[in-house]
Amino acid sequence: PPEGVDRFTDTELQASDASGESLNSRINQHRTNDIARENSSLLPAHELLTKYRYNSLNQLVWQKTPDGGITRFAYDELGRIIASQNANQVAANQFSYTTYDALGRIVEAGALTPTVGISIREKTGTLVYTATGNVVSTRVEDQYPQNISRDRVEVTRTRYNDLSIGAAEIFETVSDQSTYRSTTRNRVAGIYYYDQYSSTTLERQYDHAIFYHYDIHGNVKELVQHDKQMALTLDDPTSGMKRTQYEYDLISGNVHRVTYQKGKADQFIHQYRYDADNRIVGVSTSDNGRIWEEDARYAYFSHGPLARTVLGSRQVQGLDYAYTLQGWLKGVNGESLDPTADMGGDGSSTSDVAKDALGYSLSYYEGDYQSIGTTTGSSFVYSNSPGLESTKNLYNGNIKQMVTSLIDNNESMLSTQINHYEYDQLNRIKKMQGSQLTGMTVTPSYHSSYSYDKNGNLQQLHRATVNSQGSVVDMDALQYTYKTVTDPETGQQVRSNQLSHVDDAIAGSTFNDLSDQNPGNYSYDAIGQLIEDKQEGIRNIEWRVDGKVKKIHKSNGTEVSFYYDGLGNRIGKRVLPENKTTLY
């Protein structure tokens, strides 16, 4: 215990007084009776409660949230999480699990349905057999989780040190297996993902894999991704592999070149240049390594921040950046798109860079920026005009005002837009008023207002826009209604953060926006994940155990399935019945 804390011994806790009651019993009675004697009229009517329970090692073993229900957690003897079960999984008798190797590194994670009765003991956070109460062994030598389940789903396996597959078969930068082994020692060699996994599944039967080859310094030298959906033939086990090779400055660690699919038809190369402070100053690309296109070059202020970006080898755009004294972004290019007012002079008769296509400024408080250059007044002419500037000064980093200038597809100047923002005491935006500027003449345009409940959920949203006749008209007057749900402990109906439906008081809108919804438009599963949107024709949404969308079923019969790699990145989408597949 901490210094100054003297714990009761078991003998002291079990010692009885004259009435025969132990000290431990009297402590428990006091706790119970003291709560009963509390004056409930002095207590607030708490709603949307989130509750936590911990074991004696201060590990979270149980939690209950307003939308996510009850989740239980189990740990091994070393305090590592080995299993969990949320409200969705309880109904399906499913558990999420994690396994470790002898060095404590995660080697497998996924979900399982046990073949024997198991449960998580809430008070201790241990995984036990339901019939006997004995603790489930999670040691490597006891073959956890095979000892409780034959089949698992959505499994990610991580392999260290070496691969069971020949490295020379996978990597183009490996010629000697022993050299490969020496650079991957104690490093991740491969990450495998399996939709289905059983005790008979071979390592090579993965759905997706990521392989790593390192240089002697531990930098990734080659990264190979193998998506079997991309395989052109089943006869070649390497078909579908995509390889990316990296070249580094071995002193600074900077990436000098990235080559995708070297020597293949889809080869593409990025090359990077740096200054003496290791800041990137140029990016070039090529599909053959001989003819290069400059994508961008960068310049910096003496104190570090990015000062200018020039895009393309033809210098199609220049982006100039200005910052406040606090380091907050003040503006990009300027507000008027006038070459004489641009910080970089782009588009002027003496410049090789095309005229700016966009510019904007951000204002925080009056006098938040003063330039050391000569174009300050003209670069931010609208922000500095007393008749245009918002008087709602903010000193916490929130933006009080934004000025935006753009050109259209025909390179004609659009009206400059100035937006004023207001916030509540919790820094939530509550109002936006937009105006169009013609010279210094202000014409009100877009505006919106927001209100929230005490839990931060939107209650009302009002929006107005400019119609085709140039008049400002109401577009939305939205009212958000939230569901009541059944408390899993008490069985009573309680409030939640789950949106039930959105009412729009503006009838007959011609803006192709959100239409008025009926009560109960949205439905959710036991852990608060959206599973139905009636108005959008979404009949059901299936979710993976890691919280990513697995499949969407629509009322018209369309099914959209999504696929992921072992790191959780989306790698594919399939649409049925059209049977159209997109791979990433």
Positions of predicted regions on the chain:
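Beta-strand elements of repeat-based all-beta scaffolds
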Residues: 1-534, 539-542, 548-553, 559-575, ...
